Design a protein with these regions (language model features):
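Structural signal for terminal/edge beta-strands and the immediately following C-terminal loop/tail
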Residues: 210, 269-270, 274-297
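Conserved, mostly hydrophobic/aromatic
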Residues: 2, 35, 48, 92, ...
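Metal-dependent enolase-superfamily TIM-barrel catalytic cores that perform enediolate-based chemistry
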Residues: 56-167
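Flexible, glycine/charged-enriched surface loops at secondary-structure junctions
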Residues: 12-14, 51-54, 147-154, 225-227, ...
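Metal- or metallocofactor-binding catalytic centers and their adjacent structured scaffolds
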Residues: 1-46
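Generic secondary-structure signature for well-ordered alpha-helical cores
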Residues: 3-11, 26, 86, 112-116, ...
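Shared catalytic-loop signature of beta/alpha-barrel
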Residues: 144, 155-172, 177-277
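Glycine-rich, aromatic-flanked loop segments that form ligand/cofactor-binding clefts
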Residues: 37-69
Length: 297
């Protein structure tokens, strides 16, 4: 439904493309993201510039990235954390959920293992209720957590505001903010300090810039995250993070997660820093370079 509606559109008419796509079908942000990123890539290649220049220019030469620790036993978590720090990654994102006391124990064990220099971010993926979240926050309050990401369900704005106010903790929202309208609602409420932007859940770079602008207007930070994308998707995220002024901490750009990819990136991973480079557009090599057949029909 989307592609037939935008056939023939100029690659520079990105705002118009979004109007057409939204009129053609509701939601389906991932599909709209694919079209949006393709248009941005083509337009910046037509101009002969890297994508980040089309998004407002370079705000930083490189983007810090973090590493993830899933829900596992303390021994495994500590081993992973030490390994990440030894590689130079000083920002660790820990997933939590299920038994609250087990999560508290794991976070405290990792904090003790990596010392005070490494940053620890918590992500509950909306898995706690207010009582559980309160118990967890009290249990790790002295662990110097950088962000508590989406502790509560995305619809529970009142309890999120209460958690933020009652504990004074830095809250990062992910699942709750998929659209500019949701960003306004949460920014006005004072429920959070920052938003996570994932291109596939907001509809692409055009909407992502709108959300980031709302956050900036309210003095809030942004974390750009990829969702185990190929180099194409992660590259678009990297260019966005390079261009946004309100990136205040490491981003979740999971370039290291792709085992088999449809493209090869020209971006440079140097320790915990990811560099967008100056190639035109997103900055990935054509699939044809690897002998793959592309169906242009």
């Amino acid at each position: 439904m989307i592609l037939p509606a935008i056939v023939g559109i100029d690659c520079f008419d990105i705002a118009r493309a979004h109007i057409i796509m939204d009129n053609a079908i509701a939601e389906n942000h991932a599909a709209k993201c694919a079209v949006d990123c393709a248009l941005h890539d083509l337009a910046s290649k037509e101009l002969g510039i890297p994508l980040y220049q089309m998004l407002g220019g370079k705000c930083r030469d490189s983007v810090s990235i973090n590493r993830h620790i899933g829900i596992m036993d303390n021994v495994q978590a500590v081993s992973l954390a030490k390994d990440f720090v030894s590689q130079g990654f000083m920002s660790i994102k820990m997933k939590v959920g299920g038994n609250v006391q087990s999560n508290i124990s794991r976070v405290r064990a990792v904090r003790e293992a990596v010392g005070d220099d490494a940053k620890i971010r918590i992500d509950a993926n909306a898995g706690y209720n207010y009582t559980q979240a309160s118990e967890f926050v009290k249990g790790v309050y002295d662990c110097n957590v950088e962000y508590y990401e989406q502790l509560l369900p995305k619809w529970d704005i009142d309890q999120t505001v209460a958690l933020h106010k009652n504990f004074g903790i830095p809250i990062l929202l992910d699942e709750a903010v998929n659209t500019p309208e949701q960003a306004v609602r949460y920014a006005v409420s004072g429920a959070a300090d920052a938003f996570t932007i994932k291109l596939c859940k907001c509809g692409g770079l055009y909407r992502a810039k709108q959300i980031a602008g709302i956050a900036e207007a309210f003095g809030m930070g942004i974390v750009v995250a990829s969702t185990y994308d190929t180099h194409i998707g992660c590259g678009a995220c990297l260019h966005l993070a390079t261009a946004l002024p309100n990136i205040q901490s490491a981003c979740d750009l999971t370039t290291y997660a792709s085992q088999k990819d449809i493209a090869k990136s020209c971006h440079v991973l140097n320790g915990m820093q990811l560099h967008a480079g100056d190639s035109y557009g997103i900055g990935v090599f054509s699939m044809n370079d690897f002998g793959m057949t592309v169906n242009n029909a």
